[in-house]
Regions:
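Intrinsically disordered, low-complexity basic tails/linkers immediately adjacent to helix-turn-helix/homeobox/MYB/SANT
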Residues: 4-15, 21
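Flexible helix-coil transition and linker loops at the boundaries of alpha-helical arrays
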Residues: 32-46, 74-89, 118-129, 163-169
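"A position-specific structural signal for the A-helix of alpha-solenoid helical repeats
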Residues: 9-13, 45-56, 92-97, 134-142, ...
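Long, low-complexity regulatory tails in eukaryotic proteins
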Residues: 156-225
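Alpha-helical adaptor scaffolds
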Residues: 92-173, 182-185
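Long, contiguous interaction/recruitment modules in multidomain scaffold/adaptor proteins
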Residues: 1-6, 80
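Helix-turn-helix repeat elements of alpha-solenoid scaffolds
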Residues: 15-34, 58-76, 103-117, 146-158, ...
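Structural signature of alpha-solenoid helical repeat junctions
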Residues: 3, 45, 84-90, 127-134, ...
């Protein structure tokens, strides 16, 4: 149904930056989907809704148990694919978010996913692209988390390429912020890191995203006391 797709699009495109108002809005969307559409949806759409809900639950509660059942049931199939579907991307996001919350390392899966994901070429569907960007960002943040930098440059350049391709730079401050972290911790290049921090702060201000701007300033002050 058209209305359902509208709601799903909203859930996919909006990230939650720990903002309570957004969390409440998203909960309302999930409730509406459950009430009005869920029972009539085809199975793969039901799975998409469940995974989206689990991602939010894990993110907000910092408890990875919310995603365990879905990962157990579907993740193995995702790992066999060379072309990721929307649901595969959602599962990957859930998987690496859960690892990050549990502070677990899984380099084997990380390597396999990174090698597959950089060869994705399906840029036709805007929802898919938004999701791909979020997964790529999640993969970089996870690598920074576990101090493993092998795929970061490649993924960052892929993110920049996608932004140019689709003419949407709303994620640029996020990518600049991650680039700052990478230069600081991956390359030990403080000067470059500071440049990217400045870019991220100015970019967030330009987009009027004060929540993110303040978060970046906080991180910068931690990294450069």
């Amino acid at each position: 149904p058209k209305e359902y797709l509208k709601l799903k699009t909203k859930l996919i495109r909006q990230s939650i930056h720990g903002d309570e108002e957004k969390v409440r809005q998203r909960e309302a969307i999930f409730e509406e989907i459950q009430k009005r559409f869920y029972d009539q949806l085809p199975e793969d759409e039901q799975v998409a809704v469940e995974v989206l809900q689990a991602i939010d639950d894990v993110y907000v509660s910092e408890n990875a148990e919310f995603g365990e059942g879905l990962i157990e049931e579907y993740f193995e199939q995702t790992m066999l694919r060379t072309e990721y579907s929307t649901n595969d991307l959602l599962l990957l996001y859930l998987y690496f978010l859960s690892l990050a919350v549990n502070a677990e390392r899984d380099e084997v899966t990380l390597n396999k996913v990174c090698l597959t994901i950089v060869s994705q070429t399906n840029y036709d569907d805007t929802n898919y692209i938004h999701l791909l960007q979020r997964v790529l960002i999640g993969l970089v943040l996870y690598q920074l988390d576990i101090d493993y930098h092998e795929f970061i440059p490649e993924i960052l350049s892929m993110l920049r390429e996608i932004m140019i391709d689709i003419g949407d730079t709303s994620l640029k401050p996020t990518v600049d912020f991650i680039e700052a972290k990478y230069y600081l911790y991956g390359e030990k290049d403080k000067e470059k890191a500071l440049q990217y921090y400045e870019k991220a702060i100015n970019g967030a201000e330009f987009l009027n995203d004060m929540n993110f701007k303040n978060r970046v300033i906080e991180e910068k002050n931690k990294d450069f006391p």
